[in-house]
A protein has these predicted regions:
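N-terminal beta-strand motif that seeds the catalytic metal site of vicinal oxygen chelate
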Residues: 1-19, 77-78, 133-143
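Vicinal oxygen chelate
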Residues: 3-13, 42-45, 64-143
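Amphipathic alpha-helical "stalk" segments
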Residues: 5, 39-43, 48, 111-112, ...
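Core segments of cupin and vicinal oxygen chelate
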Residues: 9-60
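A short local loop/turn or secondary-structure capping micro-motif enriched for an aromatic residue
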Residues: 59-63, 137-140
Length: 143
């Protein structure tokens, strides 16, 4: 459990719908939660990391597009590195569930040590998520 990453993000609208997306569509697990009249939060086991969904009435969206290799990507975003098998399985599930892609699955850094397949989606509260798999995972931090 040491070195588990934690990220807290705002959820506008229906918190239950967003929890359902992470659990039923992405296959994550629901963790601890707390509901109060004017605030609520829920932890999601995001591939071994703590993603906390905080109910919010405020919009925090300031999205920009930045070029990375050959594709513009949305900033801000967060995501996870998956092994190739899990990535392909999730890619198929997202298509079957008719999840709209912000960026369709594509290969970047082709024929480079950083080669990866990546895709970007949004949760029901418009938080952008990147899902990727690297051909050489050990190259992630320049190893």
């Amino acid at each position: 459990m040491a070195k588990t990453f934690h990220l807290a993000i705002p959820v506008t609208g229906n918190l239950d719908k967003v929890i359902e997306f992470y659990c039923n569509v992405l296959g994550c697990k629901k963790g601890n939660s707390e509901i109060h009249p004017f605030s609520a939060w829920c932890d999601i086991d995001f591939w071994g990391n703590e993603l906390t969904l905080h109910s919010s009435v405020n919009e925090f969206k300031v999205n920009e597009r930045h070029l990375v290799d050959k594709e513009d990507v949305t900033i801000p975003h967060f995501g996870v590195h998956l092994d190739a098998e899990e990535f392909q399985s999730l890619k198929e599930k997202l298509s079957q569930e008719n999840v709209e892609f912000v960026n369709e699955p594509f290969i970047r850094f082709e024929e480079d040590v950083l080669e990866q397949e990546t895709m970007f989606i949004k949760d029901p509260s418009d938080n952008v998520i990147e899902l990727k798999t690297m051909v050489n995972p050990d190259a992630l931090f320049g190893e």
